[in-house]
Curated annotation (Swiss-Prot):
EC number from the UniProt entry: 3.2.1.1
Residues annotated to bind Ca(2+): E7, T10, D12
Name of the protein in its database record: Alpha-amylase 1
Record field: transmembrane: none
Keyword Calcium part of the UniProt annotation: yes
Cofactor, how bound (note): Binds 3 Ca(2+) ions per subunit.
Family, similarity comment: Belongs to the glycosyl hydrolase 13 family.
Top-rank lineage group of the source organism: Eukaryota
Record organism: Capsicum annuum var. annuum (Red pepper)
Reaction it catalyzes: Endohydrolysis of (1->4)-alpha-D-glucosidic linkages in polysaccharides containing three or more (1->4)-alpha-linked D-glucose units
Entry cofactors: Ca(2+)
Assembly with partners or alone: Monomer.
GO molecular function: alpha-amylase activity; metal ion binding
Keywords: Calcium, Carbohydrate metabolism, Glycosidase, Hydrolase, Metal-binding
Amino acid sequence: GIYCIFEGGTPDDR
């Protein structure tokens, strides 16, 4: 997974 730190700072697998 990738940490979407630019979308809130939560780990989001995309």
